Amino acid sequence: RDQRNQISFPDELQRMSDPHVVEARQGETEIFIARKNAHQGEISVLNQRISQLSSKINGLQGQRASKQELVKSYGEEVHDLKELLAEGFADKQRLRDIERNYAMVTGEIAALTSEIAGNEIQIGETKLQILQLKKKFQEEVAAKLGEVQAKLYDVSQRLLATRDKVARTV
């Protein structure tokens, strides 16, 4: 619950050398470590996914920037060819080829932009999964803590009753 790396048992429970108490402490410690490691492992996998998606986005953005430069170049070439065509110094087929290339690369930019957005959505969903995992873990820890505190209260009451009984018989 407090993001600790180990369980802190009450001093009275730490001092008890009864084999059942020692075994219970060890068991709870092992369960705690296993659950914490599993939780951290899940979060680590999700963080790696975010990192991979971020790297993919960077690559896609680089491709998009390159395509945008290409579109700019095609746009300038189309403009120049239209002027030359008007003066009779250019081939109409050449202009149509450049216009097709311009349209094709513009479509590729749109596809890259869409893919980037999809990856950004996946990052958001993965971050939400991490938050949900942390919340679920906290809820489980709080529930387990409540159970343990109830058991501890019960045991302490029985211990007090037993001590009282022993004190009266002595």
Predicted regions and their residues:
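Post-kinase regulatory C-tail/linker adjacent to protein kinase catalytic domains
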Residues: 9-17
